[in-house]
């Protein structure tokens, strides 16, 4: 019996797992840490640490990600180490027995696709490879052929229009702003209530506060006038009053002026992308399928506020078409889309096989994918 394909979503929080399953088996922080100095023989000689192991030893390591903020690969030697960890420690499988679907940004360069193919085929000796557009996979997960994706993750937010299952090149926008920036603003606000979080471990407390306590107000001005009686218990047992921190944190997604940025919020940015289209029908389709994706959109109340902002800003004739789709597990949307897509019968004609790679070389990765 053929073994299931492996799905890898290329992102700062790299999700991996098996084709046909409903959620990833692993979420690995895409970090590689190396010792700041050479260790003596008395210590275990390890050249590098991956993911949470690197974070736990941050005091004695130089840590970096092999991915750029926008999700493109910056260091192929280190990304190979990440993939090796996925195979050997996260999924504990033999790569030679599983096909691989990798979800990458739609504007990934051809030479980078070829390097991915080269590493997967030669270093891991996989039988088949498919390099997929992660935003197209999000629409597969939603079963929507047309729409606009608002995908906000750890470090980047993308607004990408999709038509007939394909990303429309040159029409989307990508911003280097995501959950990391929201966390940094939260930490700044916490300083105002005498809570100082500076170390990597302490900053994880801010992440927990955001998940448990913070929300996006439906009406920010009205929220300011409400009395805030809230309390959070720190790991050491101390209790803190968060006050307006709980609703101000996520407000920067709609009101960047709070952090000194003179630009529009993301709802207006989304409208600007849709309004680039000349066709009324195209605009209607996009407004009727605004798909939220990525962990940064999980902030409580974000979806309702986003829809309210869109409806308040769109041309009057388009208001009734506005529909914001905010499904559960949307932090896993691209991975789930890959799990579904790789299970379809049509994939048998789309895989780049090992034989094709050996005959035509890594360049065929681009040639074959362009035919799909």
What positions do the PLM features span?
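Conserved phosphate-binding catalytic cores of ATP/NTP-utilizing and phosphoryl-transfer enzymes
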Residues: 1-4, 112, 127-150, 166, ...
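Conserved phosphate-binding loops in N-terminal lobes of ATP-dependent enzymes
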Residues: 2-119, 128, 158, 168-171, ...
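A short acidic Gly-Thr/Ser loop motif
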Residues: 6-13, 142-144, 149-158, 162-166, ...
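Phosphate/ATP-binding catalytic cores across multiple sugar-kinase/actin-like superfamilies
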Residues: 81-90, 239, 248, 252-286, ...
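Glycine-rich phosphate-binding loops at beta-strand->alpha-helix junctions
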Residues: 103-112, 214, 218, 288-309, ...
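Conserved phosphate-binding/catalytic loops in two-lobed NTP-binding clefts
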Residues: 131-134, 307-339
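Phosphate-binding glycine-rich/basic clefts of nucleotide- and phosphate-handling proteins
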Residues: 163-262
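Acidic, glycine/GT-rich loop-and beta-edge segments that sit at the periphery of enzyme/chaperone cores
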Residues: 196-211, 215-229, 233, 325-372
């Amino acid at each position: 019996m053929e073994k299931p394909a492996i799905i890898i979503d290329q992102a700062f929080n790299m999700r991996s797992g098996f084709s046909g399953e409903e959620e990833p088996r692993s979420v690995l922080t895409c970090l590689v840490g190396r010792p700041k100095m050479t260790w003596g023989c008395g210590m275990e000689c390890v050249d590098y640490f991956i993911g949470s192991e690197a974070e736990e030893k941050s005091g004695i390591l130089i840590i970096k990600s092999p991915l750029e903020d926008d999700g493109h690969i910056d260091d192929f030697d280190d990304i190979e180490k990440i993939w090796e960890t996925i195979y050997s420690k996260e999924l504990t499988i033999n790569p030679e027995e599983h096909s691989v679907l990798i979800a990458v940004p739609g504007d990934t360069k051809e030479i980078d696709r070829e390097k991915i193919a080269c590493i997967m085929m030669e270093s891991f000796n996989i039988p088949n490879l498919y390099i997929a557009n992660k935003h197209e996979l999000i629409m597969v997960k939603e079963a929507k052929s047309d729409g606009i994706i608002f995908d906000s993750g750890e470090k980047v937010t993308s607004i990408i229009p999709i038509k007939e299952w394909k990303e429309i090149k040159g029409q989307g926008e990508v911003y280097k702003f995501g959950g990391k920036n929201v966390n940094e603003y939260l930490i700044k606000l916490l300083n105002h209530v005498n809570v100082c979080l500076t170390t990597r471990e302490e900053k994880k407390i801010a992440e927990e506060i955001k998940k448990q306590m913070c929300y996006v107000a439906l009406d920010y001005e009205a929220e300011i006038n409400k009395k805030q009686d809230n309390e959070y218990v720190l790991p050491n047992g101390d209790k803190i009053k968060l006050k307006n921190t709980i609703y101000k944190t996520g407000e920067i997604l709609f009101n960047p002026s709070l952090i000194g940025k003179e630009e529009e919020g993301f709802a207006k940015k989304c409208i600007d992308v849709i309004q680039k289209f000349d066709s009324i029908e195209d605009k209607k389709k996009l407004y009727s399928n605004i798909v939220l994706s990525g962990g940064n959109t999980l902030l409580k109340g974000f979806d309702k506020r986003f829809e309210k902002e869109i409806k308040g800003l769109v041309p009057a004739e388009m208001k009734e078409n506005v529909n914001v789709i905010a499904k559960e597990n949307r932090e896993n949307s691209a991975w789930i889309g890959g799990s579904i897509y790789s299970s379809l019968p049509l994939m048998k004609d789309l895989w780049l096989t090992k034989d094709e790679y050996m005959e035509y070389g890594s360049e065929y990765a681009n040639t074959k994918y362009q035919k799909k």
